[in-house]
């Protein structure tokens, strides 16, 4: 999944693309892992973990997903890598009692898995937080793109 790390004053930014929204979210998460550790060990001696988040919009969902991964790192003492993501969009309309369609405020849902690499086995720098600064999620002619800034 393609992503590039971008220099950002006192922070690090990830610019990612994906042919689908799920691919995009996984690519940004892989970029977060790359921002944390230059050499991620190959598959071996790891544990798989599940993650799930809900949010009202795509940027909020991406923020909450990345924030959850940082939390998982801190609580489980692992670096989340090799992300697999599934997204479910909110229902767009419901029938009301007057038989007219009305927009709903239901949330997007993300469920996924990642491989947890023990932090004790790698030389990782701490990514403190995801930010909304300059964050964007956009549909493009070839799929989706995102830009996310992390506080380091």
Descriptions of predicted regions:
Residues 2-152:
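Intrinsically disordered, low-complexity regions
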């Amino acid at each position: 999944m393609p992503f590039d790390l971008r220099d950002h004053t006192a922070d690090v930014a990830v610019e990612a693309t994906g042919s689908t929204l799920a691919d995009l979210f996984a690519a940004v998460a892989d970029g977060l892992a790359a921002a944390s550790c230059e050499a991620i060990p190959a598959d071996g001696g790891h544990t798989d973990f599940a993650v799930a988040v809900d949010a009202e919009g795509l940027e909020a969902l991406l923020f909450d997903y990345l924030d959850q991964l940082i939390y998982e790192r801190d609580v489980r003492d692992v670096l989340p890598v090799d992300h697999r993501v599934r997204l479910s969009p909110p229902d767009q309309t419901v029938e009301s009692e007057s038989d007219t369609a009305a927009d709903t405020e239901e949330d997007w849902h993300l469920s996924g898995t990642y491989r947890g690499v023990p932090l004790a086995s790698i030389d990782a720098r701490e990514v403190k937080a995801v930010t909304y600064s300059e964050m964007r999620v956009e549909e493009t002619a070839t799929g989706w793109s995102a830009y996310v800034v992390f506080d380091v």
